[in-house]
């Protein structure tokens, strides 16, 4: 492969990984477990979400994910930012992303704003990039709840682990 062809392939791989991560976050927001599952490798997987847990089995992760999110009162948005992606070999890559997360839990009247970053490893499987390892590092958490008179009350502030679904 020529130098130009290699550079083009590298850019196409980076773009494919960006689209993969966007599909993953969109599937999370839509609570589409099948679409989330399609974003991950079929074996040798690690999902490490710190205070939420570590998983090497995608189905175990999806079971908890659906328990936490699959209710009409749970409305969330994942925003991935500032990707740094490195193609480490023909079928291996790594990346780091900033992530901002907003959640409104209408049943408990809680709003949550979280930020942090992901560190990922990717592997090409059957010609398609997949997430092999993902680690989320929480750097800030702000949780507010509406009180009886409609004012917002601060529940958590800082890098305190916690979820609006637990409030």
What is the predicted function of each stretch?
Residues 12, 53-56, 110:
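A structural signal for alpha-helical segments
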Residues 3-5, 70-167:
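A beta-strand edge to alpha-helix "cap/lid" segment located at domain peripheries
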Residues 19, 56, 117:
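Short, well-structured alpha-helical interface segments that form or flank functional binding sites
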Residues 33-99:
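A solvent-exposed, acidic/Ser-Thr-rich amphipathic alpha-helical stretch
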Residues 15, 51, 59, 140, ...:
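Solvent-exposed, flexible loop/coil residues
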Residues 1-26, 30, 34-38:
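Short, low-complexity N-terminal intrinsically disordered segments enriched in polar/charged residues
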């Amino acid at each position: 492969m020529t130098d130009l062809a290699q550079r083009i392939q590298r850019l196409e791989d980076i773009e494919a990984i960006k689209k993969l991560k966007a599909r993953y976050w969109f599937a999370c927001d839509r609570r589409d477990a099948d679409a989330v599952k399609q974003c991950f490798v079929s074996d040798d997987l690690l999902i490490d979400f710190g205070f939420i847990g570590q998983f090497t089995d995608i189905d175990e992760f999806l079971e908890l994910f659906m328990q936490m999110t699959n209710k009409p009162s749970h409305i969330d948005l994942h925003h991935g930012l500032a990707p740094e992606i490195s193609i480490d070999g023909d079928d291996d890559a790594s990346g780091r992303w900033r992530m901002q997360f907003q959640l409104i839990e209408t049943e408990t009247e809680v709003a949550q704003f979280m930020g942090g970053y992901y560190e990922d490893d990717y592997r090409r499987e059957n010609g398609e990039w997949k997430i092999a390892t993902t680690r989320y590092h929480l750097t800030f958490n702000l949780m507010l709840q509406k009180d009886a008179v409609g004012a917002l009350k601060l529940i958590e502030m800082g890098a305190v682990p916690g979820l609006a679904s637990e409030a």
